[in-house]
Each structure stands twice: as C-alpha cells, then as structure tokens.
From Swiss-Prot:
Organism lineage string: Bacteria, Pseudomonadati, Pseudomonadota, Gammaproteobacteria, Vibrionales
Database matches in Pfam families: tRNA-synt_1c
Keywords noted in UniProt: Aminoacyl-tRNA synthetase, ATP-binding, Ligase, Metal-binding, Nucleotide-binding, Zinc
A GO term from the CC aspect: cytosol
HAMAP family, A to Z: Glu_Q_tRNA_synth
Catalytic activity, EC: 6.1.1.-
This protein's name: Glutamyl-Q tRNA(Asp) synthetase
Binding site for ATP: K236
Source organism, top-level taxon: Bacteria
Protein family (similarity comment): Belongs to the class-I aminoacyl-tRNA synthetase family. GluQ subfamily.
Cofactor annotation comment: Binds 1 zinc ion per subunit.
Length: 303
C-alpha cells in the first residue's frame, strides 16, 4: 500500500504524453504524441505532458524546452502544468523508504554478469542477505503474466520476467522508470496510457506496481512503431532526426496516415487546427494497424 494518500482526480478521461529529454522529438515521438492526443480529445478528456528527466547522463541540454516548443509549433497544446520527474524525487523516495521499512524492498549487489549466470533473470539471491547498499529491488508478490491492450487484446508477459524482483532504484542513485511512471500516473489521475509498442514488455511490471500500491491499473493502448531505412526503430538512441518545425501540417498528415487515417484530398489544403480537429473527430481504434511488429511504413528517412 501507499505510505501516504495521493490526491486523486475524477475518473473522467486523463491521458498523457511523457517524452524523455534525450533529444528532439522525432517522427516516432510524433506518432506517440498524436495517438495519445487524439485518444484523449476524442473522449473530451485532458491531455497532459510530463517530461521524464530521470536519467541526467542521457539528457541533451535544452531538449526539454525544445520538446515543448515543438509541441506548441504543432499546435498540440497540453492541459495543466508540465510535470518534470526531476522535481518529484521525494515522491519516489518516500515510497521506496516505506517498502524498505516493511521488508517489501531490499538492497542487491548482484552484477549483470551474475544475473546472466542465473539464466538472465534475477533469482532473488540478495533477498535475505540484509545488505545496506546497492541497487534496490522490489519483492514481486503480485506478478502479472497478461494484460488487455485496447487495440490488440490480451498480451502475454513471460513468467520469468513477471516473477522477477525488479530494480526500483539503481545503484548509482537514479530512480527506475517503472516506479516513477506509475507513481506519477497515479498522482496525476491518469486513466489511460497510449504509447509505442516498444513499451509493451514493462507494462506487466507497471500493472504489478498498481496492485502492490492498492490502486486500480490504467488502461493501455500500444501504437505501431516507425523504423528507419536500416530497419531500426526510430529513437533518440538511434540518432533519429528531429521533426521539421517549418512544415508541421505536412508532418502531421504523414503521421496521421501512419496511424491508419484515410486522409481526404481536401485536408491537404487545411490549416493545422483544422487538420487536428478532423483527426479528433475521425479517430477510431480499429483504424490502427493490427500488427504489433515494428512497421517500416514511412521509413524513408524523412524523419
């Protein structure tokens, strides 16, 4: 359970877009932003923006401001204040302290080499050693082996992964993504998460965290991913090019086509607000590609 009470909002739709400031928004980021925006606005809901700046060594100076400027240039205006994870460490640490005190979490000093020798999954080696330093792991008492995706139906998580005591704070002192994102989504009242299919695997762990925190999990929708011409997922780690700030309408239309919209010819003459309004009105989950494979559509190097 939680060590303190979150201030929960009403159960009307609240979605979010949560980029990391490791570089500018690229075409793959635009797909995630648009998908989450259309899903929220088509249900007359709120669309929040959160900057997930948990990993300073990977961050690019000025990237957070550039991301927000890009969203504004594309007229993807968010509701409420932008939340920065770097300003919420107290929230994460309070929950970790609670779990350490209750015995639900423990310190671990196993190396990656040792875990590889265990078969690739951590086997709880340090659970009863009562260490006082190292990474912090959560005792997994509520493993999740499947969940329902709003477009793709039941998704399965490998049992070994679901049962693993995973890290909630790294040995270098940085907080783990899974813990931070769940605590933030609860705190912000998020009801549904729309994001790329590359985040399907951690979804099971995040749902486990909801249960262990005594909270009702959010709903999940995973979107198709864009690839570059070499067959790699468009990502900041793969040095994907930032999206063009001078022709946002054409980029929006390209991303909408990727998301399965049948774009009428007259929409190519519309302004940005008209395009987005049409997108909200015509957004349907069944238009999304069925395959969970990374798709090479629109991977011709334009983004």
């Amino acid at each position: 359970m939680l060590p303190f009470c979150f201030e929960m909002t009403s159960m009307s739709y609240i979605g979010r877009f949560a980029p990391s400031p490791s570089g500018p928004l690229h075409f793959g980021s635009l797909i995630a932003a648009l998908g989450s925006y259309f899903q929220a606005k088509s249900q007359h809901g709120q669309w929040l923006v959160r900057i997930e700046d948990l990993d300073p060594p990977r961050e690019m100076p000025g990237a957070a401001d550039l991301i927000l400027k890009t969203l504004e240039t594309y007229h993807l205006f968010w509701d409420g204040e932008v939340v920065y994870q770097s300003q919420r460490h107290h929230l994460y640490q309070a929950q970790i302290d609670h779990w350490l005190q209750s015995g639900q979490a423990y310190y671990c000093q196993c190396s990656r080499k040792q875990i590889k020798e265990m078969g690739g999954y951590y086997n709880g080696h340090c659970q009863e050693l009562h260490l006082d330093a190292g990474a912090i792991r959560l005792k997994m008492t509520q493993p999740i082996t499947h969940f329902d995706d709003l477009r793709h139906g039941q998704m399965h998580i490998p049992l070994e992964l679901a049962q693993e005591d995973f890290i909630i704070k790294r040995r270098d002192g940085l907080f783990a993504y899974n813990l931070a994102v769940v605590l933030d989504d609860i705190d912000q009242g998020v009801t549904e998460v729309v994001r790329g299919a590359d985040l399907i695997e951690p979804t099971g762990r995040q749902i486990s965290l909801y249960h262990m925190l005594g909270q009702v999990p959010v709903r999940y929708l995973h979107l198709p991913l864009a690839m570059d011409k070499n067959g790699n997922k468009l990502s900041k780690q793969n040095h994907a090019t930032g999206i063009d700030l001078t022709h946002p309408a054409s980029m929006i239309l390209e991303a909408m086509a990727f998301l399965g919209f049948a774009i009428p010819k007259e929409l190519h003459q519309a302004n940005l607000d008209e395009i987005l309004r049409w997108g909200v009105q015509n957004w349907r989950l069944n238009q999304l590609p069925e395959s969970l494979e990374i798709t090479a559509r629109f991977s011709n190097g334009t983004a």
